[in-house]
Amino acid sequence: SGFVDRVDGWEHDGRLYLRVVDYKTGRKTFDLTDIWNGMGLQMLLYLFTLEREGEALYNREIIPAGVLYLPARDAVVAGSRTMSEAERRRKVDAELRRRGIVLDEPEVLAAMEEPGEAGIRFLPVKVNKAGAITGEALVSAERLGKLARHTGRILEEIGRELAAGNIAADPFWRGPDHNACQWCEYAAACHFEEGRGGDRRRFLPAVRSEE
């Protein structure tokens, strides 16, 4: 169970562009490798559900415009007495920068945040010297569609595994600080141990944004 923290909309040419926003007190990142392997899907499920069901609610064609994790914490930065105001502002902005993906359409990005003298402050993108917006967070409508279809396949697979009663310990592993066992609530009952009784970690292949 769960609920959306915030949904932002922008209406343009009869279409409603929606982005899902989640407030985070920690340093949550949008990790495509985790997403592609079936973890951290919540924000995308919200977005694609809105795309599928939203037209009946809003009487508009719904276009998914992205998902963003928004820091919900005070920006505390290290500095010195000689630090300039501009440098201090850059450090603060970096702490408050959103994480996620956004639709790679100039009009949509401008509706989210107009570039100022310092460029784009809060979206997870950059403005290069030529004035073009760049960054791995930019995704085309085609790639969002691919991600939606893949998410649907993952849900179907999860449903089949649940129906089959598959409860085998099969923890993913990307390192000592990024693995399924790190915060697992069932560790006391599971007793998973690499190499014992057939216990094996599941190493995840890295997924690049351009894929």
Regions found by a protein language model. Name each.
Residues 1-211:
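Structural signature of nuclease core domains in nucleic-acid processing machines
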